Design a protein with these regions (language model features):
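A short acidic, helix-capping loop that chelates divalent metal ions and anchors anionic groups
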Residues: 14-18, 74-77, 196-198
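Conserved acidic, metal-coordinating active-site core of Asp-based
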Residues: 110-198
């Protein structure tokens, strides 16, 4: 019998892409488990860092992970490869984002570290006006976002364990400014998470 290696993306493939309702369908869980029983290998292949690969995803059962857009590779519990952003480059980006009022987070395998105003901005985008709207508070209580609840606030943003850096748009600064400032050290990618707006 020929063994196969099958790679599964997470967002929009393995799980529903709406963060407030993220789940893995039972049919997918069954298919992955049956595939592995036949001797095939199943790997996650995702842009997510380990801290964003929640237990309900890992519990499906995978042989390994290619995560953080290729930033790390595991087989079982063994880390085969892990490329982190240099301290110098993290510091450069954090300084720029703080000086220019960006909302951002640092992705590491140990956590997702949020800038000061990121969580409140994401909650406004995801749920609505929590302070003044009962429907928004009800939505948050009934459909909490795995992503937002996993963000860690109040920690130093000058870290040595960063896989990737993600940010929300600052309407006062063109995206090209980010490319101009950081393309020497980063692949700067403009992307959209549908639930967080354009």
């Amino acid at each position: 019998m020929n063994k196969k290696i099958i790679f599964f993306d997470v967002d929009g493939t393995l799980v529903d892409v709406r963060p407030a309702r993220e789940y893995v369908p039972e049919s997918t869980i069954k298919a992955v488990r049956e595939t592995r029983k036949k001797g095939n290998l199943c790997f996650l292949c995702t842009g997510r860092s380990l801290a964003e690969i929640y237990p309900h995803i890992l519990d499906v059962g995978f042989d390994g992970i290619i995560g953080a857009g290729g930033g790390f590779v595991t087989i079982g519990d063994e880390m085969l490869y892990h490329k982190k952003v240099s301290d110098k480059d993290v510091n450069r980006v954090v300084d720029f984002f703080e000086e220019n009022d960006y909302d951002y987070y640092l992705e590491s395998n140990g956590g997702l570290f949020a800038s000061e105003n990121l969580v409140s901005r994401l909650e406004m985008i995801t749920y609505g006006d929590l302070e003044n709207d009962e429907k928004a508070r009800k939505k948050k209580a009934e459909q909490p976002s795995h992503f937002i609840t996993s963000l860690i606030e109040g920690e130093s943003m000058y870290r040595s364990d960063v896989n990737k850096i993600c940010f929300l748009e600052n309407k006062d600064i063109p995206f090209q400014t980010i490319i101009d400032n950081f393309s020497d050290a980063f692949n700067v990618i403009h992307c959209t998470v549908p639930s967080f707006g354009d």
